[in-house]
């Protein structure tokens, strides 16, 4: 694996983590608050 390819893969992984974790937290938070609001 070339250093360029390695850096590209790492940037994809880090970018995915930076996007996925807040999205997951937001979805869990919204689903919890929605549940309370509906009942």
UniProtKB/Swiss-Prot annotation:
Protein name, entry field: Photosystem II reaction center protein X
Entries under HAMAP family matching the protein: PSII_PsbX_1
S-S pairs: none
A Pfam family annotated for this UniProt entry: PsbX
Location(s) in or outside the cell: Cellular thylakoid membrane
UniProt xrefs under InterPro entries: PSII_PsbX, PSII_PsbX_type_1_subfam
Taxonomic source organism: Synechococcus elongatus (strain ATCC 33912 / PCC 7942 / FACHB-805)
Membrane topology: Single-pass membrane protein
Thylakoid keyword on record: yes
Keywords: Membrane, Photosynthesis, Photosystem II, Thylakoid, Transmembrane, Transmembrane helix
Entry similarity comment: Belongs to the PsbX family. Type 1 subfamily.
Complex formation: PSII is composed of 1 copy each of membrane proteins PsbA, PsbB, PsbC, PsbD, PsbE, PsbF, PsbH, PsbI, PsbJ, PsbK, PsbL, PsbM, PsbT, PsbX, PsbY, PsbZ, Psb30/Ycf12, peripheral proteins PsbO, CyanoQ (PsbQ), PsbU, PsbV and a large number of cofactors. It forms dimeric complexes.
Entry GO CC: photosystem II; plasma membrane-derived thylakoid membrane
Entry function: Involved in the binding and/or turnover of quinones at the Q(B) site of photosystem II (PSII). PSII is a light-driven water plastoquinone oxidoreductase, using light energy to abstract electrons from H(2)O, generating a proton gradient subsequently used for ATP formation.
Transmembrane segments: 8-28
Domain of life: Bacteria
Tagged with keyword Membrane: yes
GO biological process, any: photosynthesis
